[in-house]
């Protein structure tokens, strides 16, 4: 058995950053909706509430609009998981 740290996205903190950058840049939800040419603002509200993440394409657009990088938007955490196979033993073989 081995234990490794698996990177994950902190959805709640990422949602807060998405909303924070929008507010800091002075955009309304409707303006972001127009930039994406969405029929409704539901997706933006869902991103900002942490219901789900934007697609990678939409993250690229958000980063460009807000003048930041995708790494600035996404909050990364790690969780420890157990492996059935000890990958350290495999690497040395």
Outline where the language-model segments fall:
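DNA major-groove recognition helix of helix-turn-helix/homeodomain DNA-binding modules
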Residues: 57-72
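The alpha-helix within a helix-turn-helix
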Residues: 22, 33, 63
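Short alpha-helical DNA-recognition segment
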Residues: 26-46
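A short, Lys/Arg-rich alpha-helix, primarily the initiator
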Residues: 1-24
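Residues within the helices of the helix-turn-helix
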Residues: 19, 30, 60
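Short, charged recognition helix plus adjacent turn
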Residues: 2-8, 64, 74-93
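DNA major-groove recognition helix of helix-turn-helix
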Residues: 47-48, 58
């Amino acid at each position: 058995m081995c234990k490794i740290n698996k990177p994950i996205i902190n959805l709640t903190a990422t949602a807060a950053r998405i909303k924070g950058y929008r507010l800091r840049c002075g955009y309304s939800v409707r303006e972001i909706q127009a930039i994406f040419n969405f029929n409704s603002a539901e997706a933006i509200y869902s991103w900002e509430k942490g219901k789900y993440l934007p697609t990678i394409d939409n993250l690229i657009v958000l980063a460009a609009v807000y003048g930041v990088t995708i790494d600035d938007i996404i909050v990364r955490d790690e969780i420890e998981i157990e492996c059935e196979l000890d990958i350290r033993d495999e690497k040395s073989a």
